[in-house]
Amino acid sequence: MIPDCIPLAEVPHTTRLFADYLAHSAKLQAFYPALKYNQNLAAYTSSIQYQPGTRDRVATALQILNERLGASPEALANIERLRRGAYAVVSGQQVGLFGGPLLAVLKAAHAVRLARDLTAQGTDTIPVFWMASEDHDLAEVDHVFLPKNDFSLQRFTADATGTTGAPMSDLRFEPTIENLVQQTSELLGDSSLVDILRESYRPGETVAGAFGKLFARLFAKHGLVLLDPADTELHRIAAPLFRRAVAEAAEIARALVDRGKELEHAGYHEQVKVSASSVLLFGIQDGARVAIQRQNDHFSVGKEKLTQEELLARIDAEPEKFNANVLLRPVMQDTLLPTLAYIGGPAEVAYFAQGSVVYERLLGRATPILPRFSATLIEPKVEKLLEKYDLKFEDINHGADALAEKLAQKTLPPELDEQFRVALATVTQTMAQAKDALAKVDASLVEAAERATSKMRYQVGRLHRRAARAALRRTHVLSQHADLIVNALYPEKELQERTVGAAYFLAKYGLDLVDTLVDAAGTCPEHRVIRV
């Protein structure tokens, strides 16, 4: 039986940096100044400098935004708590179609759970979800994958209209979105979730706005506060940060280049390529997001050249025409919010290693970052097959063909399977005895004996696999079972949470599944298995 909590070392695609971060490796301390606070977030409150005037302005902006998204009384009450002095736990994600992959809901659930726990422990904290509405890559968010009856995935793609390269806060769904919701309902069946999709995803609604309305409903009782960084008032509050990103661009770029070298020297790599001309801002020109580069004493904004004074004046006049890149975004977040912790995935954890120099220069501190809630949901039909074949989580992560072969091995005639087991044991035992005898004759022969043992074990195992493939050819049932298990738990050779739309689970198991995920979020520090 697969355990409820799986070490991330057994989970595919875990990078060295992320594994070291989970292990609290001492060599990462220089890259994560706030790592020491991860086990005691309340102690970090003394590091947060947050002006009452900023608190009030941000709370008012969040109130207006969340009311527009249909916020619950619980969410609006949390905004008032922020106004009165509460801290924030923040997570965020791209505004994927119909809520995007499962991991977006997992992140929000983790923020809710952590804020709840911190408040219970005496540190008043609210959960905030940062919608990545300023991203401009529509191809990353215009689709969702939902499982069919055999758990193979069906892709649903939406049409959105607007300027090419425009942020998600400006792109609007075309009338075809109604047909897409109907197609989704035909696959998922009628449910409360589908009703919410119909109300949220309507012609003319922005990509970010529809996502926000959906999440406002999903997390209504939990008081999740949604933040749209494209909001004009939030840009006005962040304008001084944007000014410093320009005025100190040369020093920031130099610090980032040096940090990249330090990461490489430590055996890691930088997530974002930075050069001496890099500026951590984008500009908006003709509705599209364009990079800003520094060239000696001038700056290029797309094809336009400006002096530093001209660029700073433009930021003062129209701060909403600028937004932060991936390294400045967390600093903007923590300029706007009294952030006690950010909950991020492996890539975000890696960004923090590089971006902490930006934090320290522009904010005077670095925010603690916690690995996000990671989980695989196992449905009853799949669970029965896992139990039938006595499978482990790692058995699933090599694709359907490898799993089918594994299943065939498990279903070989018991006497044949036992003979292979005995053969391996005999080879190992016999060669161990031979190795001991050889050591007395000539110690140099021990290594040769070990190589011979390895080759013989390989050949026995190879013959075992060939026997399994022969058995597999005689039945399609094992292949079907392997396909079903892999499609459900490791689709497209990715973790389920990164691929399967949360809408599938919420439609099938009800909106109360959100409560289950919130409760589960604090129970496993690595990868959680949840049986639904």
Curated annotation (Swiss-Prot):
InterPro entries, per database record: Bacillithiol_biosynth_BshC, CC_BshC, Rossmann-like_BshC
- Cross-referenced Pfam families, in alphabetical order? CC_BshC (PF24850), Rossmann-like_BshC (PF10079)
Coiled coil segments of this chain: 431-451
Keyword terms: Coiled coil, Ligase
MF annotations from Gene Ontology: ligase activity
Q: Which superkingdom is the protein from? A: Bacteria
For whether the record's keyword set contains Transmembrane helix, the answer is: no
Question: What EC number(s) does its UniProt record assign?
Answer: 6.-.-.-
Q: Give the record's family classification.
A: Belongs to the BshC family.
Q: What is this protein called?
A: Putative cysteine ligase BshC
Q: Name its species.
A: Koribacter versatilis (strain Ellin345)
* Gene name of the record: bshC
